Amino acid sequence: MHSDPQSVDLVRREVIETAETLVVKVGTNVLSRDDATLDVDRIAGLVEAVSRVRATGRRVVVVSSGAVGAGIDVLDLGGRPEDLPHLQAAAAAGQARLIHHYDECLGQHGSHAAQLLLTADDFTER
């Protein structure tokens, strides 16, 4: 289709600039410091950028990783766990902290964060 990288970038930019709704997936690496803990300043920067886009009348949905990094801070683990039980504990403890930071930053722009809770029917009924 478009084999030229510049052409692909132009198409991507046009799609982003004309879309009514943008879905932004934020990976753990974007939100993590070198020590694997949560970088709250990155959340603030992301929220600032999202707010600027929303001010143009477009909808923005943020899908975020980062709960494990937030949980490392909460549980004072000193680094990313390797085993599944500790990863699960970090994610569980960190999810509330992550949502709190998003909500705090979004509140400064008149918005709120919410966690979408899915059921099995959400996958079978659509």
Located regions from the model:
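Nucleotide/pyrophosphate-binding catalytic subdomain
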Residues: 1-126
